[in-house]
Swiss-Prot record:
InterPro entries in the record: UPF0216
Protein name, entry field: UPF0216 protein PF0452
Family that this chain belongs to: Belongs to the UPF0216 family.
Entry superkingdom: Archaea
Pfam families the record matches: DUF61
């Protein structure tokens, strides 16, 4: 069973190669001429400036707390939901989806139904990314 687990972990690592090596704050990216980050596979991912400006309006005073890209975690255990982590990121997603602050009380993590994913990705295509998480 050990070998199978190792193979699964390698495959998950490979399908997550599009994730960033390190994330940058929204404020940092807005200062760059060509806002981008380096991915785990060594390539660069570029952000649309218009999208960054839109996020800034959603984040308000907390713009520097928002780390990009916002990671949408998809788990093998919790198939009907996804998770967003980080205070700034959670606030932005709640505002984007027009969710009441008191519906999802946790401040640093939010677990939402997957049917919100198309809306998020349509409005934030360059500033959000999927992460595939295996749990068993």
């Amino acid at each position: 069973m050990e070998k199978v687990d190792r193979i699964i972990q390698m495959e998950i690592g490979r399908i997550n190669s599009h994730l960033p090596k390190a994330r940058k704050s929204l404020c940092e990216l807005l200062k760059e001429d060509s806002p981008s980050i380096e991915l785990r596979d060594g390539s660069l991912h570029y952000f649309r400036r218009s999208e960054l400006e839109f996020l800034k309006t959603l984040a308000g005073e907390e713009a520097c707390l928002v780390k990009l890209p916002i990671i949408l975690e998809l788990s093998t255990l919790d198939r009907g939901y996804f998770v967003v982590r980080g205070r700034g990121e959670v606030r932005v997603i709640k505002k984007l989806l027009e969710l009441s602050e008191d519906i999802y009380l946790e401040e640093n993590t939010v677990r939402l139904p997957r049917y919100y994913l198309p809306t998020i990705r349509r409005k934030l295509p360059t500033t959000t990314v999927y992460a595939f998480i295996t749990e068993w």
